[in-house]
């Protein structure tokens, strides 16, 4: 496909599949590879071809369409970002200039990377009747009248992988949150010796029995090189099994996120590891949340916002910006990432009074 979304294809099929109010709501979801002709591709962030998930729905009323799009945004995307990716974001709506083409409202989740730039992690769109009108998506109501549907769409892509790398990674490589990690614990033999390898297998069996996703590295190649390889891959916990500690029934457990080490009895590794994995998950989220708060500056005007955007995010009254202010921000490659209520909640639309905006440089 040449289009970054399947809206045109799905719109045509919705018009064929929907005949009656009994066919509503129609809820469609797909995973597919899409192509977008990027002039300056960036790995994981803006690649010419990428895997993404997109959903499209049709409803009998605006309220139903809006409620479903909002539910996806808060209960699916935001839940996944916070509780799996350990990625705090600012939830809000896009200003008119940044909305998805044809949408009457676009919800977004904006994350901050370690360099202070914003990354749009996921979006959900209220399309009103605009797409239904363009593709003749009608249904017959209970009263026998032909009525236009209300539609929504929402999507996320492998851009989240880029967000994961830039949000949590460090100079040693990836740092993967435990709930996401395909391998949560790697058990490494310090030396390739039968007794050590047997102990590694025993530790792995205990971890598997405790529901931990585990991999064993049986000591082929230098120990230092293998440790470095697993650090690059971001495995949350490393259990080192060496002949010296093994004589006393001990192993060393190392956290990837902090590098903290603890020596444990071999038989106590499984319960301790399970506890540590949950601790790491929480610590990674809270650490990222603290960095986001620390790098978000409340400012009074656009010049201050531009200055703050050199190192992080700026928050200011939306009334101070408007279309003219957006143009002024863009001169310095700063954009309005989202609009929020003053308490940080997501507004229904951009006409609400007393809104604030989050501005930043972005990927």
Which role does the model predict for each range below?
Residues 1-363:
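NTP/phosphate- and nucleic-acid-binding module
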């Amino acid at each position: 496909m040449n289009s970054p979304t399947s809206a045109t294809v799905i719109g045509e099929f919705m018009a064929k599949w929907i005949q009656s109010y009994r066919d509503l709501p129609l809820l469609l979801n797909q995973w597919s590879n899409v192509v977008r002709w990027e002039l300056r591709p960036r790995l994981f962030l803006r690649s010419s071809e990428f895997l993404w998930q997109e959903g499209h729905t049709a409803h009998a009323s605006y309220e139903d369409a809006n409620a479903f799009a909002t539910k996806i945004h808060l209960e699916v995307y935001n839940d996944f970002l916070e509780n799996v990716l350990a990625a705090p974001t600012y939830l809000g709506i896009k200003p008119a200039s940044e909305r998805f083409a044809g949408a009457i409202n676009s919800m977004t989740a904006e994350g901050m990377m370690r360099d202070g730039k914003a990354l749009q992690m996921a979006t959900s769109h209220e399309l009103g009747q605009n797409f239904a009108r363009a593709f003749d998506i009608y249904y017959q109501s209970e009263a026998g009248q032909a009525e236009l549907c209300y539609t929504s769409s929402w999507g996320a892509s492998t851009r989240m992988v880029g967000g994961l790398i830039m949000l949590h990674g460090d100079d040693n490589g990836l740092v993967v949150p435990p709930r996401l990690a395909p391998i949560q614990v790697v058990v490494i033999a310090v030396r390739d010796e039968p007794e050590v390898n047997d102990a590694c297998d025993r530790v792995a069996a205990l971890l598997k029995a405790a529901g931990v996703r585990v991999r064993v590295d049986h000591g082929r190649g230098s120990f230092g090189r293998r440790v470095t390889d697993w650090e690059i891959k971001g495995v949350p916990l490393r259990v080192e099994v060496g002949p010296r500690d093994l004589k006393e029934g001990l192993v060393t457990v190392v956290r990837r996120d902090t590098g903290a080490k603890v020596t444990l009895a071999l038989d106590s590794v499984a319960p301790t590891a399970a506890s540590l994995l949950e601790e790491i998950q929480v610590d990674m989220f809270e650490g990222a949340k603290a960095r986001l708060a620390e790098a978000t500056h409340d400012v009074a005007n656009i010049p201050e916002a531009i200055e703050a955007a050199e190192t992080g995010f700026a928050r200011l009254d939306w009334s101070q910006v408007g279309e003219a202010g957006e143009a002024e921000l863009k001169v310095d490659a700063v954009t309005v990432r989202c609009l929020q209520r003053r308490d940080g909640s997501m507004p229904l639309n951009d006409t609400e009074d007393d809104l604030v905006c989050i501005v930043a440089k972005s990927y």
